[in-house]
From Swiss-Prot:
Belongs to the cytochrome P450 family. It is a single-pass membrane protein. The chain crosses the membrane at residues 1-21. The keyword Transmembrane helix applies. CDD domains: CYP71-like. Heme binds at residue 440. This is Cytochrome P450 71B34. Disulfide bonds: none annotated. It comes from Arabidopsis thaliana (Mouse-ear cress). Its EC number is 1.14.-.-. PANTHER family: CYTOCHROME P450 71A9-LIKE ISOFORM X1 (PTHR47955:SF19), CYTOCHROME P450 FAMILY 71 PROTEIN (PTHR47955). GO terms for cellular component: membrane. One of its GO terms (molecular function) is iron ion binding.
C-alpha cells in the first residue's frame, strides 16, 4: 500500500512539474510589441485605405517586428530587410503556407491557383508546371517576337499622337501593351478588336485586384464579419467580380478556339489537354476550375504588375528631369540610329536598370507581400511567432528604411552604382517579387518586359508635361488594392525623337 501511495505521489509531482515548466516556458516567450487595439476588432481600424502606409507609420513607433490583432487573428508585420531575411530565408519553411482569405477563396476557386494555394504537393506541381511552360528563360526568349510586334504597334500609335501633339494616358497605354503581350503569350490569341480589348475589361482587372487586396471583416471576425461584409457591400462586390472574371475566362476559351494563331502548343492548350487526360497534380484531378484559377495569376499579375512599374517609372522620370535626360542619353548613345531596340540591346543599359530598381524600391507593385501563415513555431529578432500566426512583409516600408537607404524619399538611381543588389529575392533590401519558396515565379518575364517597354518609350520619344502643368503638379498618390498603381492617371505629351 505504501508503494502505491509513493508512486501516486511521484506521478502527481511529475504532472505538476510538467505544467509548471510549460507555463514557465510560455512566460519566457517574447511577444513582439503591439499597438493598443479595441475590443473585438483589435487593430483593424488602424489599417486605413492603404495598409502598407499605415503599418509603416506604426513600425516607426513599435519597431520592425510588430504584432497586431486583426479581429481574432494574430498578425505579425516585419518592416526591415533583416527581419524580412529571417522570415523569407532563414525560417522560410516554417511560414511558407497561406492563410485563408475570402477574396482569394472566391476568385481562386477555393485556392486552386499558385499565389494563394496552401503549401502542399498540388502547389509544388502546379508552380513547377507554370515555370517550365511559361516563365522559364527559354520560354521568355521564345515570346520575344510577340513583344517586338506589340511594342511596334505601341510606338506607331504614340507616333500618331506625337504628330498631332496629343497627350497620352500612360496608365491605359501601358496596361494595353501588357494585356496584349500576356494574352497572346498565354492564349495565342490577338485580342485587338475583341470584347476583351475594352475599358470594361481593364475595370474588371482592377476590381479583382482590389478584392484580392482588401481586408474583409469575415476574415478576422467570425460570424459577425460576414454580416458586416454584406452590409458594406463587400460580399456583393466579390461575388460580382467572380462572375465577371468567370465570364471572361469562358470568352477567352471561346476566342482561343476560334482565333488561335498558328504555332506550337501554348499554355492554355497544355492545360486543356491535361484536363482532357484527367491529369493529377498533387492529389487533385485537373478540372476547368483549376485552369481558371491558374490563369487568374497569369492574367491579373502578368497584365498589371509590369504596366504599374512602367507607369511609376515614367512618373518619377517626369518628376526628375535630370534622371530622364541621363537615362535617355544612355539609351540613345548605346542604340545609335537603329529603327528598333532588340532584346539584347537592353543588356547594355545599366542606368536604365538602376532606374527600374529605384522605381521598385519606392513603388513596389505589391507593397505588402501576400501574407504567409506559420506552420510551426519560430523566432524573428528573438520574438516568438506561434503556429497559425499570419505574417506580412512590408516591402514598401523596407524601401523607405533610413537604416538601409540614405535619403530614402529621394528618387536617386545612382544609389545602385557599384553594388550587386538585384530583385531576385536574395537581397532583402529590394523585394519587388518577394522571396523564398513563395517568390513570384515570373521574375525574369516581368523584368525583361519592363526593361524592353521603357527602353522603347525613352528611345523613340521625348516626354513633356501638358501645357500649364509643372513638375510639382505631378502627384504620386496610390490607389488601393493587392497591387498599387498610381491613383491619378499619368498624362504626358510625346515628341518624336527619331524618324528612322
Amino acid at each position: 500500500m505504501t508503494n502505491i501511495w509513493l508512486l501516486s505521489l511521484i506521478f502527481v509531482i511529475c504532472i505538476l512539474v510538467a505544467v509548471f515548466n510549460h507555463k514557465n516556458r510560455r512566460n519566457y516567450q517574447r511577444t513582439p510589441p503591439s499597438p493598443p487595439g479595441c475590443p473585438i476588432i483589435g487593430n483593424l481600424h488602424q489599417l486605413g485605405e492603404l495598409p502598407h502606409q499605415s503599418l509603416w507609420k506604426l513600425s516607426k513607433k513599435y519597431g520592425p517586428v510588430m504584432l497586431l490583432k486583426l479581429g481574432r487573428v494574430p498578425t505579425v508585420i516585419v518592416s526591415s530587410s533583416e527581419t524580412a531575411k529571417q522570415a523569407l530565408k532563414i525560417h522560410d519553411l516554417h511560414c511558407c503556407s497561406r492563410p485563408g482569405f475570402a477574396g482569394a477563396r472566391e476568385l481562386s476557386y477555393n485556392y486552386l491557383d499558385i499565389a494563394f494555394s496552401p503549401y502542399d504537393d498540388y502547389w509544388k506541381e502546379v508552380r513547377k508546371l507554370a515555370v517550365q511552360e511559361l516563365f522559364s528563360s527559354k520560354q521568355v526568349h521564345s515570346i520575344q517576337p510577340i513583344k517586338d510586334e506589340e511594342v511596334k504597334k505601341l510606338i506607331d500609335s504614340i507616333s500618331e499622337s506625337a504628330a498631332q501633339k496629343t497627350p497620352i494616358n500612360l496608365n491605359k497605354t501601358l496596361l494595353a501593351l501588357t494585356v496584349s503581350v500576356v494574352c497572346r503569350t498565354a492564349f495565342s490569341v490577338n485580342f485587338e478588336g475583341t470584347v476583351l480589348n475594352s475599358e470594361r475589361f481593364n475595370n474588371i482587372v482592377r476590381e479583382a485586384l482590389e478584392m484580392l487586396g482588401s481586408f474583409s471583416a469575415s476574415d478576422f471576425i467570425p460570424y459577425v464579419g460576414r454580416i458586416i461584409d454584406l452590409l458594406t457591400g463587400l460580399q456583393g462586390r466579390r461575388e460580382r467580380s467572380m462572375r465577371d472574371l468567370d465570364a471572361f475566362y469562358e470568352q477567352m476559351f471561346d476566342l482561343h478556339k476560334q482565333k488561335k494563331e498558328e504555332g506550337s502548343e501554348d499554355f492554355v492548350d497544355l492545360l486543356l489537354r491535361l484536363e482532357k487526360e484527367e491529369a493529377v497534380l498533387g492529389n487533385d484531378k485537373l478540372t476547368r476550375n483549376h485552369i481558371k484559377a491558374i490563369l487568374m495569376d497569369v492574367l491579373l499579375a502578368g497584365m498589371d504588375t509590369s504596366a504599374i512599374t512602367m507607369t511609376w517609372a515614367m512618373a518619377e522620370l517626369a518628376k526628375n528631369p535630370r534622371v530622364m535626360k541621363k537615362v535617355q542619353s544612355e539609351i540613345r548613345s548605346q542604340i545609335k540610329n537603329k529603327e528598333r531596340i532588340s532584346f539584347d540591346d537592353t543588356d547594355k543599359l545599366e542606368y536604365l536598370k538602376m532606374v527600374i530598381k529605384e522605381t521598385w524600391r519606392l513603388h513596389p507593385t505589391t507593397p505588402l507581400l501576400i501574407p504567409r501563415e506559420a506552420m510551426s513555431e519560430f523566432e524573428i529578432n528573438g520574438y516568438t511567432i506561434p503556429v497559425k500566426t499570419r505574417l506580412h512583409v512590408n516591402v514598401w516600408a523596407i524601401g523607405r528604411d533610413p537604416d538601409t537607404w540614405k535619403d530614402p524619399e529621394v528618387f536617386l538611381p545612382e544609389r545602385f552604382t557599384d553594388n550587386n543588389i538585384d530583385a531576385k529575392g536574395q537581397h532583402f533590401e529590394l523585394l519587388p517579387f518577394g522571396g523564398g519558396r513563395r517568390m513570384c515565379p515570373a521574375v525574369y518575364m516581368g523584368t525583361t518586359m519592363v526593361e524592353f517597354g521603357l527602353a522603347n518609350l525613352l528611345y523613340h520619344f521625348d516626354w513633356k508635361l501638358p501645357e500649364g502643368m509643372k513638375v510639382d503638379d505631378i502627384d504620386m498618390e496610390e490607389a488601393p488594392g493587392l497591387t498599387v498603381n498610381k491613383k491619378n492617371e499619368l498624362i504626358l505629351v510625346p515628341t518624336k525623337f527619331l524618324d528612322p
